[in-house]
C-alpha cells in the first residue's frame, strides 16, 4: 500500500468541540494539542516524512483576546515541553508563516526549536503559524519586487514559506467544515 509522503491537516473545530463537550473553547484547544502528539507518533509509525499542521491562521487574530492568549500559551507550552521529544524522535521542526506578530519570547522559542532540530530527518513537522496562503503569495511577490527580479512561477516558489517542501498528498480538515481556510 502506498502511503502519503506529505500529510497536511487543518486543525479546526477544537474550540467548538470544547464548547459543546466541556463548556469551554479553551479546553477544546487543550484537547486538540493532546491529539497532536498522537498524530505525530502515528506519522512516524507510518513512515510519513512530512506533516504540516495549520495551527494558527492569520484570521485567528480576530478571536477574543483571552482565547488568543490561551492559544499563545499553548504554543509556548508545546515548544517548552516537546523540544526534547522532537529531538529524541528525530523530528525536524519548520515554521511557515509570519511569526513577527507573535510575542518576542515565542519568536525566539520558535527559532531555537527550528535550529535545535534542523539535523533531524525522520519526520519534518511543519507548523503553519500566523499563516495564510494569500498572505504568503503577496509576501513572496513583495520580496521579489523589492529585489527588482522578474516575476515568474519559479521565482515565486523560491520566495514562498513552503519552498523546498513537497506538495501535500492528502489534506485533512477536522471539525466538520468543508473549506480550505486560506491554507496552502
Identify what each model region corresponds to.
Residues 1-183:
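Flexible, compositionally biased loop and terminal segments
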Amino acid at each position: 500500500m502506498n502511503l502519503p509522503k506529505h500529510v497536511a491537516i487543518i486543525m479546526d473545530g477544537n474550540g467548538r468541540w470544547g464548547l459543546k463537550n466541556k463548556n469551554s473553547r479553551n479546553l477544546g484547544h487543550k484537547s486538540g494539542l493532546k491529539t497532536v502528539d498522537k498524530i505525530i507518533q502515528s506519522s512516524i509509525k507510518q513512515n510519513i516524512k512530512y506533516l504540516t499542521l495549520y495551527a494558527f491562521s492569520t484570521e485567528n487574530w480576530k478571536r477574543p483576546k483571552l482565547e488568543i492568549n490561551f492559544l499563545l500559551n499553548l504554543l509556548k507550552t508545546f515548544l517548552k515541553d516537546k523540544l526534547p521529544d522532537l529531538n529524541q524522535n528525530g523530528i525536524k521542526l519548520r515554521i511557515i508563516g509570519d511569526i513577527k506578530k507573535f510575542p518576542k519570547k515565542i519568536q525566539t522559542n520558535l527559532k531555537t526549536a527550528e535550529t535545535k532540530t534542523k539535523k533531524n530527518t525522520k519526520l519534518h513537522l511543519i507548523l503553519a503559524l500566523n499563516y495564510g496562503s494569500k498572505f504568503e503569495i503577496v509576501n513572496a511577490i513583495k520580496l521579489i519586487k523589492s529585489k527588482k527580479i522578474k516575476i515568474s512561477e519559479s521565482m515565486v516558489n523560491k520566495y514562498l514559506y513552503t519552498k523546498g517542501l513537497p506538495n501535500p498528498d492528502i489534506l485533512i480538515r477536522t471539525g466538520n467544515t468543508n473549506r480550505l481556510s486560506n491554507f496552502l
